Amino acid sequence: MSPNHTPDTASVFQLKGSMLAITVLELARNDLEALDRQLAAKVAQAPNFFSNTPLVLALDKLPADEGAIDLPGLMRICRHHGLRTLAIRANRIEDIAAAIAIDLPVLPPSGARERPLEPEPEVVKKPEPAPAPPPPPEPEVRPTRIITSPVRGGQQIYAQGGDLVVTASVSPGAELLADGNIHVYGAMRGRALAGIKGNTKARIFCQQMTAEMVSIAGQYKVCEDLRRDPLWGTSVQVSLSGDVLNITRL
């Protein structure tokens, strides 16, 4: 303890005035069952308002000819709904006596005008809609690649992001690849793979179909299948429908 302070001079508390907002429940009649039902309805409207809320029970508006109120029962109902009774306001002798018996403070009747306090219903916020997914990036479109010389066996020619046009013959063992369509304006004896990145609308156009293999978006036919087609060796186009390659005459 500081030598400059003694138990008689060192203050351990202060009394201060304060304006606190206290909810007042003004009872109009002695009907605890109706009060319980109506409080439950109020709690359903705004449950956060009724959460350990300090309360003054105003009994000074009860008719004088009504019987004594069950004050402990009234406080239990209030406590059940989240209202904590701090004191009562009363003018009837029986109500004041009931409060004194349970050591509950009694305030004098109020002459001030009080406005009804209605808890605002809680607004339930609707969840924000999920943002729309961004559109898939547009495939990079490049100019058509044009090959004017014969394509020999073992060569591989790829048209990235576009179509491939070959104006000469394609030998066995040669391979043509394109992200788009393939056009061969000569004998097609090698392999032609169009739409290799999944473009199911790609097509293959051949002046003379004698290919080792044709493929669109991963669906293919090899030479053994193509030879059985009546259009073998003629001018055809190859398209994809579902997972079936269709060969039709040009």
UniProtKB/Swiss-Prot annotation:
- Regions of biased composition (Pro residues) lie at 129-138
Q: Which NCBIfam families does the UniProt entry name for this protein?
A: minC
Subunit: Interacts with MinD and FtsZ.
Instruction: Name the Pfam families for this protein.
Output: MinC_C, MinC_N
Q: Name one GO biological process term.
A: regulation of cell division
Family the UniProt entry places it in: Belongs to the MinC family.
Instruction: Name the gene for this chain.
Output: minC
Q: Where is this region: Disordered?
A: 110-143
Q: What does this chain do?
A: Cell division inhibitor that blocks the formation of polar Z ring septums. Rapidly oscillates between the poles of the cell to destabilize FtsZ filaments that have formed before they mature into polar Z rings. Prevents FtsZ polymerization.
**UniProtKB keywords:** Cell cycle, Cell division, Septation
Protein name (record): Probable septum site-determining protein MinC
List all Basic and acidic residues biased stretches: 112-128
Which source organism? Pseudomonas putida (strain ATCC 47054 / DSM 6125 / CFBP 8728 / NCIMB 11950 / KT2440)
